[in-house]
Amino acid sequence: MAKKGIERLKQWIEESDNIVFFGGAGVSTESGIPDFRSVDGLYHQKYDYPSETILSHTFYRNKPEEFYRFYRDKLIGFEAEPNQAHKKLAQWEQDGKLKAVITQNIDGLHQAAGSRKVLELHGSTLRNYCEHCGKFFDVEDIRNGEGVPVCDACGGPVKPDVVLYEEGLDQDVLSEAVQFIKNADVLIIGGTSLVVYPAAGLIDYYRGNKLVLVNKTPTARDGVADLVVQGAIGEIFGQL
């Protein structure tokens, strides 16, 4: 069935110049980045507090030392390279087929692969800002530092540009994502279980008839998809 599905997806991609991709953690797991919700993902690794608690706005405010210990260890403590999925998406954009990548990931791997139009719903670990004066710090500044990072210009606290639990998504990014999805001919959703809202609700804005779900395991929305291809997204995209 997967082979048949891949052939149909290949045909849709060949025929379209208005593809939008919406992806989650599964897109980056083949690059060695742990998925929050999989059995061996972040939420199942032992720490003093549950990951959901540590990655919350309240915890960041109240226990910044513990937050940054976890953040350095689990979110930026490794070098990752783009995989087949990232590279293929960048190629489709270059070929004039793909209009945008909408991602729930915070790792910057789409840009590293060459994608230009990337809407990051949950921000990026590559960007960090002083909360007082707005000075920018890149990920190496945070990775190589110790304890709670402070701004070398004004002494203010430095915060990663990622959306923590209890924080709202950037409304401008969200609105732009909705527009791309509304206007898409082919909407490919990959590497997400479609359980995190409001991001998961974005697919309701799609009005076409080529909704494709690519995921290792079944999702809550398989029933409404026009095509479901089950498997690792990098492997599948490598065949397209």
Residues covered by each model-derived region:
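Conserved catalytic core of sirtuin-type NAD+-dependent deacylases
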Residues: 1-240
